[in-house]
């Protein structure tokens, strides 16, 4: 019974802005609370808030799969388009086939959108942890913007143009091989996520008028 409750539990997509730094002074904390109250009000009043607009892709790829799963779990029927057009009085077997196919379509649609989301995609970069460690070591040694690698000419030019030259961990020769492997894997993941997006959108285009119960 406990396993069933966990399976049927609705997944949430919070509109609240979380604490992002280790220390917040009272003014910063109060400002975050006030923004969160505004986001909650907007969600209740309009159905979406400013944070949803700022991350509309993430909102869509998180909310839609959850709604599809919930529809699939609680639905009471399926589209008549899944029945044989010549079959005006479908028997029990035909209804079971249609119901099973509709469940498969909803599950596939949810799966495609969930895989298209970089936060929930099951395809992971095997070099991600290693590259993160290299990046942190770079920041600690050369600064967040790699400012300790700037040449005298760059410093003078930055002052003259009022700009900041940024140096990255990928510029160091000892990191180049790992960076190439990391970016190659990211290209594969990006292509996979784009394919999943296209497949999910094609299913949504075909069945969007049937997403009700």
Model-predicted regions and their roles:
Residues 2-207:
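Long, non-globular targeting/processing and low-complexity regions
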């Amino acid at each position: 019974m406990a396993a069933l409750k966990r399976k049927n539990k609705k997944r949430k997509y919070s509109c609240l802005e979380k604490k992002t730094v280790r220390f917040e002074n009272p003014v910063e904390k109060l400002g975050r609370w006030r923004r969160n109250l505004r986001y909650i009000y907007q969600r209740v009043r309009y159905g979406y808030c400013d944070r949803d607009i700022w991350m509309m892709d993430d909102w869509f790829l998180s909310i839609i799969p959850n709604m599809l799963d919930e529809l699939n779990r609680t639905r009471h029927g399926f589209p008549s388009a899944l029945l044989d057009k010549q079959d005006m009085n479908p028997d029990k077997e035909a209804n079971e086939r249609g119901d099973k196919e509709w469940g498969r379509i909803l599950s596939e649609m949810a799966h495609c959108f969930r895989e298209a989301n970089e936060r929930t995609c099951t395809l992971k970069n095997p070099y991600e942890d290693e590259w993160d460690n290299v990046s942190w070591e770079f920041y600690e040694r050369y600064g967040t913007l790699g400012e300790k690698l700037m040449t005298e000419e760059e410093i003078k030019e930055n002052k003259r143009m009022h700009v900041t030259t940024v140096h990255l961990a990928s510029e160091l020769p000892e990191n180049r091989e790992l960076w190439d492997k990391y970016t190659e894997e990211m290209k594969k993941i990006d292509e996979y996520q784009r394919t999943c997006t296209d497949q999910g959108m094609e299913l949504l285009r075909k069945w969007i008028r049937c997403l009700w119960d």
